UniProtKB/Swiss-Prot annotation:
One of its GO terms (cellular component) is extracellular region. The modification Leucine amide is found at residue 14. Expressed by the venom gland. This is Mastoparan-C. GO terms for molecular function: toxin activity. It comes from Vespa crabro. InterPro entries: Mastoparan (IPR013213). The keyword Secreted applies. Mast cell degranulating peptide. Causes hemolysis of guinea pig erythrocytes. Its mast cell degranulation activity may be related to the activation of G-protein coupled receptors in mast cells as well as interaction with other proteins located in cell endosomal membranes in the mast cells. The keyword Protein transport does not apply. Belongs to the MCD family. Mastoparan subfamily.
Length: 14
């Protein structure tokens, strides 16, 4: 997992 993918998921949750 890279940071960009993690941020994309976090944005969807938030």
């Amino acid at each position: 997992l890279n940071l960009k993918a993690l941020l994309a998921v976090a944005k969807k949750i938030l």
